Amino acid sequence: MGEASPSIAKDVTELIGNTPLVYLNKVTDGCVGRSRAKLESMEPCSSVKDRIGYSMITDAEEKGLITPGVSVLIEPTSGNTGIGLAFMAAAKGYKLTLTMPASMSMERRIILKAFGAELVLTDPLLGMKGAVKKAEEIQAKTPNSYILQQFENPANPKIHYETTGPEIWKATAGKIDGLVSGIGTGGTITGTGRYLREQNPNVKLYGVEPVESAVLNGGKPGPHKIQGIGAGFIPGVLDVDLLDETLQVSSDEAIETAKALALKEGLLVGISSGAAAAAAVRLAKRPENAGKLFVVVFPSFGERYLSSVLFQSIKKEAESMVVEP
């Protein structure tokens, strides 16, 4: 992990972390509180999962569980964790096999293969549970293999406790009132939230999940379009007792908010960032939150979603363009 410094990084791992925060200014009509976005889209591989790609591999190495050039790493992913692991595996010399629901974007498939990962697609109707099961099947027949288990691995929230939390606390000069984060594995909000609560017990922690798969609110798992959150089960690394509230955002609202962030704020982000922003704006409109500062995590860059429903209409428009004489 890197530290803020003008020096040249020794390798790509030193580029991870220390992402900037920026105020949301144009999608905030009716808000009485303020929102700052933590731009994890500016990680070296464009997502918050770069942090846990680094932490889970490094932790396993330090414990003697894996060895470069010998161990085969296996992991179920919705895409971004896979990419975070893939660039680390390439840099360190590991073979990596990933299982991923076929509903995830084409960009994810291409990027994973560009880093040399072996990719196995699973039934999209089975969601992440199907990807997890397939990963376990592959491990059972693969010698020298190791599943990193992002949904259960303590190294996931630990890296956010050690880096994301302190970064936010420092950037806001300790004036943060609430953290808003979409919940995939739950590692970001658990680790970051623990650190922030230790600094100020009054900091509120707000999760975000798809309304179509509102498991944390007692609902049933279901298909949705917000890639990266709403796994359909409660992950082991998520500390649900930390959460003050988990807001529900529909796929359509997440998509429209992500589009608005590009058009009004100049921020090209993914669908889960749209979901988190929609939740943050909703919170900032509540009268009791007047004058309060929310930090909302934007997990990934929008270019990873060009083939997805997020840019479907624009893609069709671009494809139908003709050359002007």
From Swiss-Prot:
Keyword Coiled coil: no
Subcellular location: Cytoplasm
Family as reported in the entry's similarity comment: Belongs to the cysteine synthase/cystathionine beta-synthase family.
Cofactor: pyridoxal 5'-phosphate
GO biological process, one term: cysteine biosynthetic process from serine
Keyword Cytoplasm listed: yes
UniProt pathway annotation: Amino-acid biosynthesis; L-cysteine biosynthesis; L-cysteine from L-serine: step 2/2
Signal peptide positions on this chain: none
Reaction(s) the record says it catalyses: O-acetyl-L-serine + hydrogen sulfide = L-cysteine + acetate
Protein name: Cysteine synthase
PROSITE patterns: CYS_SYNTHASE
Enzyme class, UniProt record, top EC level: transferase
Superkingdom as given in the UniProt entry: Eukaryota
Principal subcellular localization: cytoplasm
InterPro entries per record: Cys_synth (IPR005856), Cys_Synth/Cystath_Beta-Synth (IPR050214), CysK (IPR005859), P-phosphate_BS (IPR001216), TrpB-like_PALP (IPR001926), TrpB-like_PALP_sf (IPR036052)
Example of a GO cellular component annotation carried by this entry: cytoplasm
Record EC number: 2.5.1.47
Sequence positions bearing N6-(pyridoxal phosphate)lysine: K49
A Pfam family it matches: PALP
Assembly, per entry: Homodimer.
Record's keyword terms, sorted: Amino-acid biosynthesis, Cysteine biosynthesis, Cytoplasm, Pyridoxal phosphate, Transferase
Species classification: Eukaryota, Viridiplantae, Streptophyta, Embryophyta, Tracheophyta
Molecular function as annotated in GO: cysteine synthase activity
UniProt-annotated binding residues for pyridoxal 5'-phosphate: N80, G184, T185, G186, G187, T188, S272
